[in-house]
Amino acid sequence: MTYRDFIGRLKENGKLVEIQQPVSPIFEASRIAKKTKGPVLFHNVSGSKVIMNLLGSRDELSSMLGVPKEEIIKKLSEVSPEGEVRLVPGSPTLEVIESEVDLTKLPILTHFEKDGAPYITAGIVVSEYEGVMNASIHRLMLVGKDKLAARLVPPRHTYLLHKKAAEKGETLPVAIVLGCDPTIIYATSTRVPAGKEFEYAAALRGTPVEVFECSNGIKVPHSEIILEGYIDTKERVDEGPFVDITGTYDMVRKEPVIHITRIIHRKDPIYHGILPAGPEHLLMMGVPYEPRIYRAVGEVTTVKNVVLTEGGCCYLHAVVQIEKQTEGDAKNAIMAAFAAHTSLKHVVVVDEDINIFDPNDVEFAIATRVKGDMDILTITNVRGSSLDPRGASDGTTTKVGIDATKVLIEKENFERAIIPEE
């Protein structure tokens, strides 16, 4: 399914809000996207089309994957990154070629009052060095007509490729993809073996991913917009402030500069923007960890489902549903979840009769099945998330696991009343 096909399906299903009147890229588009929550297509942001909240809910992920919402994580946990990638000679992305680079002509958004600059938030940075390729989403701060500052997180793959090239005095060629097949957007948000992002996307959608070669040799999928360039060897600038998944400002750091040398795009391209700390940002950060937790818990007990909750920024809080068979199962599940996602701060384990997508049902389990001195596991001075405002300066935190499952020998005490159907 193409990017435009997916947008068309949203429209056909009545799930796309369209804004025809002019909208400012400074705060206004973000303000509307935050209020709308669902997919919203702006037809005139500084004369350009912009879509936000494209994959902003599990309903959109369900549509993308072709499975019910409750089966998303089971599906993702079963897919291996072994799909087919095909190199093709041309692309609709080549409809317009701009050698005179001016990034300010793009509808790059300013989202919050203290943002360091306008930010590209949905750019997939594709890089390759010495035969090793990577594709991943990075926040990109506008610092000039042909320059972007990229937040490269150590020790992730783009950071390592740039480090390796810089140590040899060489620039790292990159191509920044904006607006492509949603399965590719998801695949490049997750953790797969180096260079397997496009293969994973192909496996997810069940059809090959076509790529074409940019002028700098980087191979990219068909997209709305491609920014070709390179990451400078030594040049660094202040990057930030920027709002991260907790809705608070991340710190300002010295980060590498990407020089853009050419822009190619579709006619009348649809720019993709992700609202920082918005629903799409949360899902793209969190959902890729759910299959990892699912598989890890499955090694120690019978796992039924996993969710990283919206209230926990889809990153810091998890609810794990198991089929409990022994009294140790829930605590084993807690430890497995923490091992699978080291940024996880709090985890709740529940039984099969609890709807993990309903916060009230999860709270009911905690209220009626937890005895504080027996069912709460506290682990101090362990690695946490750099995104947690309450974490220590050395990156450590305290983690809490809650066993909100029934006591097996007293199961009848926890039976929930049912009104029979007629």
From Swiss-Prot:
Its EC number is 4.1.1.126. One of its GO terms (molecular function) is metal ion binding. It is an enzyme of class 4 (lyase). Pathway: Isoprenoid biosynthesis; isopentenyl diphosphate biosynthesis via mevalonate pathway. Mn(2+) binds at residues 134, 197. InterPro entries: UbiD, UbiD-like_C, UbiD-like_N, UbiD_Rift_dom. It catalyses: (2E)-3-methyl-5-phosphooxypent-2-enoate + H(+) = isopentenyl phosphate + CO2. The active site is at 244 (proton acceptor). Pfam families: UbiD (PF01977), UbiD_C (PF20696), UbiD_N (PF20695). Belongs to the UbiD family. Catalyzes the conversion of trans-anhydromevalonate 5-phosphate (tAHMP) into isopentenyl phosphate. Involved in the archaeal mevalonate (MVA) pathway, which provides fundamental precursors for isoprenoid biosynthesis, such as isopentenyl diphosphate (IPP) and dimethylallyl diphosphate (DMAPP). This is Anhydromevalonate phosphate decarboxylase. It comes from Methanosarcina mazei (strain ATCC BAA-159 / DSM 3647 / Goe1 / Go1 / JCM 11833 / OCM 88) (Methanosarcina frisia). The lineage of its organism: Archaea, Methanobacteriati, Methanobacteriota, Stenosarchaea group, Methanomicrobia.
